[in-house]
């Protein structure tokens, strides 16, 4: 029986670097562990999934396309996650919701039956595009709410900013 799988939600706006972070994490995966990655694509074409999918020992991928994971009572998500967990029997689970989704609603679903005994939710990780924020891009209300709840905020893409923008 599967239980207490460390589960990491890696969220943020479109283009913030979620898929790149997951690729970097996968490169650091201990050889003896099995990991699973569930990716949500808002559209029907799974670009992020295509970027991640490759033959990698001990890593299983699944994708839920066509809307955010928490919508439509989460039925596609529930099915996709259930199938992934049964197939992969992972030691760790990474979930990348769409940058257009509602990650806090997804976390609420994961805290409910049947997942509460199966998954050990870790504090969410939120990536933000520092260059976009410095240029005046605004976070949606759901992104602002996640930023307040995140265990780790990563300001990505800051290398193009001058020192004043990075520190101020």
What are these regions, as identified by a protein language model?
Residues 2-11, 16, 20-136:
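Nucleotide-state-sensitive switch-loop elements of NTP-binding domains
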Residues 26, 96, 143-144, 167-168:
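Short amphipathic alpha-helical segments and helix-helix/interface helices
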Residues 32, 149-150:
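Structured helix-beta-strand junction loops
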Residues 87, 144-147:
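A short, aliphatic-rich alpha-helical micro-motif
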Residues 97, 127-132, 150-168:
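G-domain G4 guanine-recognition motif of GTPases
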Residues 138-142:
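Charged helix-capping and loop-helix junction motifs
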């Amino acid at each position: 029986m599967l239980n207490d799988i460390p589960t990491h939600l890696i969220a943020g706006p479109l283009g913030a670097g979620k898929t790149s972070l997951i690729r970097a994490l996968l490169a650091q995966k201990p050889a003896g562990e099995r990991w699973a990655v569930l990716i949500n694509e808002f559209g029907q074409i799974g670009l992020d999934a295509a970027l991640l999918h490759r033959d990698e020992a001990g890593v299983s991928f699944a994708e839920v396309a066509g809307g955010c994971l928490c919508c439509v009572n989460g039925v596609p998500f529930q099915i996709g996650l259930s199938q992934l967990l049964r197939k992969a029997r992972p030691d760790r689970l990474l979930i990348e919701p769409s940058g257009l989704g509602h990650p806090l609603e997804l976390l609420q679903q994961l805290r409910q039956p049947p997942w509460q005994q199966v998954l050990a939710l870790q504090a969410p990780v939120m990536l933000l595009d520092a260059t976009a924020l410095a240029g005046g891009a605004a976070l949606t209300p759901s992104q602002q709410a996640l930023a307040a709840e995140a265990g780790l905020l990563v300001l990505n893409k800051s290398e193009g900013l001058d020192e004043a923008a990075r520190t101020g």
